């Protein structure tokens, strides 16, 4: 939360239940290489440290993403997962302009808006969703027909803005999207 460094217990338990060991990294660290060499994946959580108000958090995310891209480009698999605000950080960084004050837009998705996922064609063909469908078709159908996606954020990236950003489009594909209470479309995060 702006000015503090914490990880929600729910996030830690979720990661540990998946068999992962959690190593917290302070967002104000200057030991990026040291931490990077201690981990084999990166999770950028949701929370309250927005890029426009917490530059040190943004710079930490940017440095670790650059290290992850370099590792992957060198053939060393290094996964990165961004949840909600973490995904927002990843999109701002991938856009390449560091426009942390203006890149995100407001959405009316606060206060536990639960929705089904609307998959794009690329999303349905993605490795993540294709494998899920092949192992359990009812799982994917459930994601598309049941209110399973918790939307509890006021900021995001519209599908239109995502489409206009050439660098962002080269880096990521929208797998699914949702509409907020006012009908504004954003990529699911």
Protein language model features and the residues they cover:
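N-terminal beta1-alpha1 cap of cysteine-dependent amidohydrolase-like domains
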Residues: 1-188
């Amino acid at each position: 939360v702006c000015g503090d460094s914490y990880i929600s217990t729910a996030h830690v338990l979720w990661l540990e239940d998946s068999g992962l060991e959690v190593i917290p990294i302070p967002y104000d660290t200057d030991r990026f290489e040291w931490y990077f060499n201690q981990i084999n994946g990166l999770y950028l959580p949701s929370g309250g440290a927005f890029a426009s108000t917490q530059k040190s958090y943004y710079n930490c995310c940017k440095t670790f993403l650059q290290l992850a891209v370099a590792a992957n480009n060198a053939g060393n698999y290094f996964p990165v997962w961004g949840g909600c605000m973490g995904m927002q950080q990843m999109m701002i960084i991938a856009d390449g302009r560091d426009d942390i004050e203006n890149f995100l837009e407001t959405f009316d998705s606060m206060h536990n808006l639960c929705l089904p996922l609307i998959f794009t064609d690329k999303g349905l063909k993605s490795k993540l969703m294709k494998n899920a469908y092949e192992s359990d078709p009812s799982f994917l159908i459930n994601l598309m027909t049941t209110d399973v996606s918790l939307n509890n954020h006021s900021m995001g990236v519209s599908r239109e803005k995502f489409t206009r950003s050439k660098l962002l489009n080269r880096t990521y594909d929208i797998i699914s999207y949702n509409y907020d209470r006012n009908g504004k479309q954003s990529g699911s995060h």
